[in-house]
Amino acid sequence: MANDFLFTSESVSEGHPDKVADQISDAILDAIFEQDPRSRVAAETLTNTGLVVLAGEITTNAHVDYIQVARDTIKRIGYDNTDYGIDYKGCAVMVCYDKQSNDIAQGVDHASDDHLNTGAGDQGLMFGYACDETPELMPAPIYYAHRLVERQAQLRKDGRLPFLRPDAKSQVTMRYVDGKPHSIDTVVLSTQHHPDQSETPTKMKASFNEAIIEEIIKPVLPKEWLKDTRYLINPTGRFVIGGPQGDCGLTGRKIIVDTYGGACPHGGGAFSGKDPSKVDRSAAYAARYVAKNIVAAGLARQCQIQVAYAIGVAQPMNITVYTEGTGVIPDAKIAELVREFFDLRPKGIIQMLDLLRPIYQKTAAYGHFGREEPEFTWEATTQAAALRAAAGL
């Protein structure tokens, strides 16, 4: 990639229909883990106008009121009025869970290559990434896209912008100069709203646009990056019909929003609703942990990690490090340090990151990475000093 370029990432709010589905799936996972953290969970959710469908595979000793968990999640998000297309009090909730296949369970319970360890719950490849563009070691476009929709929800819930409704999307186009963030070229923010905020079906009131720019966008974005920035606020105009009424929502459809905004590859596996025996989730978290510690240690300005697994096998098929020329030691040497300092077998990941806890609903909106939440152990840099010393820095 050239040193001077534009790069764009997007995010969506907790009221976006796909994120409603993700949050219900992870709320159900948490409710199960509160009683039985050894459960096997693959909870999928569909949301539509006035309807929630819960399906997937769950093996557990927990007794959970799945319908109530779904309703509570919808209420917390803010869908408490039939005018919004779904109302937690009156929506229909269908429960269609099966148990995990015994054929899968036998390979997960006892790895074929190490019977004292658990095997991977499926084959697949996962990526982790970190860079020095923000203090959180995340790419700037996705980091700030998340913060925009997070602030939209905050101002909606605390009543400062009472005309906002739950569904919203953001997009940040960053201008890079010499490979580093220089300024923000364009910000797009589309938010659901009360009907009285549009002048015509294709034009919003000037006061609405001003409130979005002054109360949501400018307080979030660094002032030094706002140089001739374009602001596109509800560019198609009226956005009253939204959430599950505007679009059917499904678990796992926002995998780029959930990760790095397109700044690195994605293996294709979604996170929400999956217990950590599923390496789609746990190994992606571990790969972020590894990459972040490498950058925090000063071994590279940016770092991409790929790991891959075979179902029922504990050891990863590969651990590949790519620093795009920013590493201070060879990538192959960094990969050796990864193998030395990080146990990337499924059971090792679960122990290393303490993943058998009800911590997942919080991950299901505003990004799984780059958030300094105490439960997000994969964001810690506890191995940075050891890596730096081992590299001789």
Swiss-Prot record:
Binding positions (K(+)): 44
Cofactor(s) this protein requires: Mg(2+); K(+)
Keyword check for Transferase: yes
Instruction: Fetch the PROSITE patterns from UniProt.
Output: ADOMET_SYNTHASE_1 (PS00376), ADOMET_SYNTHASE_2 (PS00377)
Q: Which Gene3D superfamilies match?
A: 3.30.300.10
Compartments it resides in: Cytoplasm
Binding annotation for L-methionine: 57, 100, 247, 278
Q: What class of enzyme is it?
A: transferase
Judging by the UniProt lineage, the source's domain of life is Bacteria
Residues that hold Mg(2+) according to the record: 18
Question: What EC number(s) has UniProt assigned to this enzyme?
Answer: 2.5.1.6
Any one Gene Ontology MF annotation carried by this entry is:
methionine adenosyltransferase activity
> What S-S linkages are listed for this chain?
none
In which pathway is this protein known to take part? Amino-acid biosynthesis; S-adenosyl-L-methionine biosynthesis; S-adenosyl-L-methionine from L-methionine: step 1/1
Q: Could you mention a single GO BP entry for this protein?
A: one-carbon metabolic process
Q: Which reaction does it catalyse?
A: L-methionine + ATP + H2O = S-adenosyl-L-methionine + phosphate + diphosphate
What the protein does comes down to:
Catalyzes the formation of S-adenosylmethionine (AdoMet) from methionine and ATP. The overall synthetic reaction is composed of two sequential steps, AdoMet formation and the subsequent tripolyphosphate hydrolysis which occurs prior to release of AdoMet from the enzyme.
Q: Tell me which family the UniProt entry assigns to this protein.
A: Belongs to the AdoMet synthase family.
PANTHER family named in the record:
S-ADENOSYLMETHIONINE SYNTHETASE
Q: How does it assemble?
A: Homotetramer; dimer of dimers.
What's the protein name? S-adenosylmethionine synthase
Species of origin: Variovorax paradoxus (strain S110)
Source organism lineage?
Answer: Bacteria, Pseudomonadati, Pseudomonadota, Betaproteobacteria, Burkholderiales
